[in-house]
Structures are given as structure tokens and as C-alpha cells.
């Protein structure tokens, strides 16, 4: 027994992950103290690359454990402190509240969402029109709500669609209650090709929607967390923010929608998959079955969900309270008026978001390392000492590149603070400050679609229950985002350059 104990420890470490992956993480943990002893600055950048690696391998092992071990070691080594981690977490408390309560609130609206989107999916046969609709609706919603909430809606809808067909493909019919849609072992061989086609179809729709959240999120004061931060420093109201950013956000919105049409038309970068006929038939049968067995109580529940949806949108658009608190309001309204009062039924709503919330706090620990080790400082100083005529476009590029690897809220905070200090000191004019604020806002919002760690909504999608179901890996997300990354970055750069040129 004693001889097998070390093997048991080794097997338990990171669970079912591959041996090579476990070895790699252990190697990281051994190497980091050595690199830190040589040069803390280099060690900080090594930690960022290691954390990105854990995100890239999210389908092999959830990043919370390996990323968490790396973050704990960073604190122990002194690369950052518990106080700094807490400060970064506290600064993003609104995002944490949003994840805990808003995602759970969306869970209790899934019946209505599935009903509405089933009608849309079955009513529109053109994949290009459907893709454009997903992207445009996500953009409009994100301009007035927030990207994480919209992404949570997209995830809930896609999981609902997937579960319906997967259950049928596994021989479970359309009415079996005891069913696990994560298990492919029972899928009939005759249905596997259609299942793969359906996965590809859902992947493309979800990615169009996810990029749509970035297209709309950049436009308004409430679209992304960093937008509000920038608006506060620039003293812009809702309308002024929209008008200041519009010379960049509107061309990129058009470019994004054209890209959506182009990739679907050409069938490149993983796009172009059509909804298999058999899947369409099953979804139509499901819709008919649900309609036929819908009772007055079910209809009442849908009405309550619709009314709660109106309350949600109005509250968010008018910013009546923090997003997370509005999510809690939705939970209370839906569970109260739809009779969901058992603790175990309520608890399921929180299963999706809490692991990601924990991962996000680990991410904030990495951000704390970036802050305490001043990893971005050389780039910041270089930009502020450039000629004013090129500062705008260069700020756009720098913010875009850094937001691809770090938290875009953190990047925006660093740069808008430095620029505001320069304005207060009289080093730059108010007009130039406005230009740089636009460059920072668009730089952190647009090119950051390149990687899942660039935007919280993308990271949430990558680590959600949906990603493994539709085989949406880190690499595949990067590939599918690539045409959007290129188009948004180029158009955004040109627009900022034109704005700077006057």
C-alpha cells in the first residue's frame, strides 16, 4: 500500500488531465522561483504566458486549478501581495456581483429564451441573415446592457438547442427527464454526422454573437466596465460618450457586420455551416410538442419571464442599480412569481457562474502581479514621450495588444490615469486628451477580441458548460475571431489615425 501512495498522489494531482500537462504545470512551479530570483520583471511576463497557456488548455483542465497554483506561488514569492490581490478584486466587485447574480437570473429565464430563439431559428432559413441577426442583436443589446449578460443569454440558448437534439440523437426522444447531454457514448452512429454539423452551426452563431457584444459594447458608456471608467475621467455623459467614440465605433460596427456576411458566404475560418435538415426537423417537432403540452401555468411562467425581461432591460439601460443587484432583483421576481422556492432548484442556477467567478479572482491576482511589477510601465512611458501626432494611433495599438493578454479594464485604468495626469499637469491639451481617451477606449474594446483572455465575456464563453459541448477550444476561438480581429483592428486604427489628423 505504501509503495502505491506516491502514485495515488500523482494520479490525484489535476485529476484526469494528461500526464504531460501535469508535468508542464509542475515545471512551471519549479521554474518560476528561479526566474524570479534572476529578474522579477521577466518572471512577471513568464507568469502571464503560463497563465495564458492554462487558458488555452481549458478543455483539458479547467484553468482555476493550474492558474490558481501559479497565482498562489506568485503571492508566496512576493511578486504581488494578498493586499494587492484583494484591491484588484475589490475594484472589480461589480463584475463579480454580475457573474454571481445576473447569470443566475438568466438561468431562470431560459424557458422564454429557448421559446423566442427557437421561433427565430426555425423562422429564418438563411444562415447569413441568421448570423447577421445574432451579431446585430448582440451588438445592440451590449450597447445598452453589458457583454457578460448578453453572452450568458447566448450560452443559455445554445445549451438549450444542443440538449434537445443531443437527447434525440442518443435515443432519448424529446421527453426524457433523466438525461445527460454531455455524454456522447449513447449517440447513434447514424446521428453523429448531423451532431457534428450542428456543433459547427452553433459555434459559428455563438462566435458571431460574442463578437457582436464587442461591436456594441464599445459604443456606449454602459457597454463595457472600462467605458464607464474612461467616461468618469473624461467627464462625458451618455450622449457625449457616444458622439466622441462614434467616428471609430460606427465604421468598425459596419466592418464587423460585413465580415460576418463575408465569412459565412465564403465558409472560411470555421464559418458557413448550415443547420442540418434532420436537426431542423427535430427542433420543429420539439417546438410543436412544447406548444401542445403547454399548460396555463406554463404560459403564466413565460409571461412572468417576459415581464422580468422588460424590468431587466429598463433597469440596465437606465442604470438604476449595479448590474449584479439588478440580477438579484430578477432572481427574486422570477422565483417568487413562478413558484421556485426549493433551495436545490435555486442552487442549480449558480453552478454555471461560480467556477468562472473563482477563476476571475485568480486572473485578478495575475493583474496584481502586472501592477506590482510594473510590467506595462516601459510601454506607457514610451507612448507618452512620443510626438503628439502619432500618440493617438500608437495608444490604440498598445492598448489593443496589451488587452489581448491582460484584463482590458486594468489596461484602460493604467492608461487613462496616466493621460489624465498629463492633462492635469498641463502637458497635453483637452482636445488631445479626448483623442487619447477615444484611442484607449476603442483599443481596449476592439482588438481584444483576438483572444479569450482579452475580454471577460469571451473568457466566460470559453470556460462555460457550452464550450466542451460544441468543441469550442481556445485555439478555435482565436481562429474564428481572426477575421474580426484583423478587420476591427485595421478599421479602428485608420479611424483613430483620421481622427488624430483632424
UniProtKB/Swiss-Prot annotation:
Annotated compartments: Cell inner membrane
InterPro entries: Na+/H+_antiporter_NhaB
Transmembrane segments: 27-49, 66-86, 95-115, 128-148, 149-169, 241-261, 299-318, 350-370, 394-414, 450-470, 477-497
Keyword tRNA processing included in the entry's annotation: no
NCBIfam families associated with the record: PRK09547.1 (NF007093)
PANTHER family (alphabetical): NA(+)_H(+) ANTIPORTER NHAB, TRANSPORTER ARSB-RELATED
Membrane topology recorded in Swiss-Prot or TrEMBL: Multi-pass membrane protein
Signal peptide: none
Taxonomic path: Bacteria, Pseudomonadati, Pseudomonadota, Gammaproteobacteria, Cellvibrionales
The gene coding this protein: nhaB
Similarity comment: family membership: Belongs to the NhaB Na(+)/H(+) (TC 2.A.34) antiporter family.
Natural source organism: Teredinibacter turnerae (strain ATCC 39867 / T7901)
Main location: membrane
Chain's role: Na(+)/H(+) antiporter that extrudes sodium in exchange for external protons.
HAMAP family: NhaB (MF_01599)
Protein's UniProt keywords contain Cell wall biogenesis/degradation: no
GO molecular function: sodium:proton antiporter activity
Catalyzed reactions: 2 Na(+)(in) + 3 H(+)(out) = 2 Na(+)(out) + 3 H(+)(in)
GO cellular component, one term: plasma membrane
Protein name: Na(+)/H(+) antiporter NhaB
Keyword annotations: Antiport, Cell inner membrane, Cell membrane, Ion transport, Membrane, Sodium, Sodium transport, Transmembrane, Transmembrane helix, Transport
